[in-house]
């Protein structure tokens, strides 16, 4: 009995494995057939070359704020604009010289802290820019020595 069962099991296992392999290959050919039937364009993926744009290069509209402070306390508002990544043109013509100098000192520190830049663009007029704004070129102006010594 044992020898007969062993032979029977031996031959029956081969048959089962063969059937299993046959089913396996049948599934593979069925999967290949399904892949061939799928359309070339998938709705989730665009066909062809993809154009990728960095999100950092797409910005909201940039703003330039014009400010004409009358007192030193308004310097903090200007600094807040710079922290919000907005360029600010500061006109200091209507403020006393000592107050104007304090404002320029305060804004210089603010601009340094955020990695920006401050430039004099006219008599008592300054351009303060955050790090996301690049200023190119210069404005040449004939300034008398008295005004030049003021700053």
UniProtKB/Swiss-Prot annotation:
Extent of the signal sequence: none
GO CC term (a single one): cytoplasm
Record keywords: Cell cycle, Cell division, Cytoplasm, Septation
Compositionally biased tracts (Basic and acidic residues): 24-39
Pfam family of the protein (one): SepF
Residue span of region Disordered: 23-53
Matching Gene3D superfamilies: SepF-like protein
One of the GO BP terms on file: FtsZ-dependent cytokinesis
GO molecular-function terms, A-Z: identical protein binding
Superkingdom, taxonomy of origin: Bacteria
Compartment list: Cytoplasm
Subunit structure comment from the entry: Homodimer. Interacts with FtsZ.
Record's function text: Cell division protein that is part of the divisome complex and is recruited early to the Z-ring. Probably stimulates Z-ring formation, perhaps through the cross-linking of FtsZ protofilaments. Its function overlaps with FtsA.
HAMAP family tied to this protein: SepF
Similarity comment: family membership: Belongs to the SepF family.
Protein name: Cell division protein SepF
Organism phylogeny: Bacteria, Bacillati, Bacillota, Bacilli, Bacillales
